[in-house]
């Protein structure tokens, strides 16, 4: 458990230091993928084709670490979000999101959505139904940290509908 906390704190510290890059003067809405990736601290990876069925819009997946603790850079185009989903575990498990660039959203089932900005960290316990993704007018990148556990699995659920997403301010 101490290793997980240490890794999470190290990732947050590194991300905060690296994300202090200047913003695009044109505004993020007009920013291209190439422009956005120049200001992100992590390589966005490749199109997230393996999980495309669970996303509205284009996302990209870049592995940062696949040993000990899985850490992946997930990059979302403006308006892109994943479906509602749950990270199940018999013991431990869950997910940690560390926001690195752009603006995004996180929402737990039955609660108000929370705006995400670089340096923000979200701890998601196992068993919590939630979604996350980019703001409508901004590219967004976060690190997804897979919290180790026993009997872990993901359950992908219904999409976040356009009418629900459009109400976010």
Predicted regions and their residues:
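A short, N-terminal "cap"/entry segment at the start of jelly-roll beta-barrel domains
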Residues: 21-72, 83, 153-169
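Conserved hydrophobic/aromatic beta-strand scaffold that supports enzyme active sites
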Residues: 61-63, 71-75, 96, 113, ...
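A short beta-strand-loop-beta hairpin characteristic of the jelly-roll/cupin
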Residues: 81, 91-118, 128
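Short, charged/polar surface micro-motifs in flexible loops or helix N-caps
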Residues: 69, 77-80, 103, 150
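Conserved short histidine dyad/triad with adjacent acidic residue
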Residues: 72-91
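Bacterial Sec-dependent N-terminal signal peptides
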Residues: 1-27, 31
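Ligand-binding loop in jelly-roll beta-barrel domains
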Residues: 105, 117, 126-154
């Amino acid at each position: 458990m101490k290793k997980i906390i240490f890794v999470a704190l190290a990732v947050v510290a590194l991300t905060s230091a690296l994300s202090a890059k200047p913003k695009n003067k044109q505004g993020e809405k007009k920013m291209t993928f190439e422009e956005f990736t120049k200001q992100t601290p992590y390589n966005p990876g490749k199109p997230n084709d393996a999980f495309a069925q669970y996303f509205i819009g284009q996302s990209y997946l870049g592995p940062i670490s696949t040993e000990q603790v899985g850490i992946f850079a997930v990059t979302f185009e403006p308006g892109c979000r994943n479906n509602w989903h749950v990270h199940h575990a018999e013991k431990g498990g869950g997910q940690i999101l560390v926001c690195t660039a752009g603006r995004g959203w996180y929402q737990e089932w039955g609660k108000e959505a929370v705006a995400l900005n670089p340096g923000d960290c979200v701890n998601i316990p196992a068993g919590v139904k939630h979604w996350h993704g980019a703001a409508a007018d901004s590219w967004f990148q976060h690190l997804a940290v897979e919290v180790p556990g026993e009997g872990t699995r993901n359950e992908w659920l219904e999409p976040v509908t356009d009418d629900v997403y459009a109400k976010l301010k």
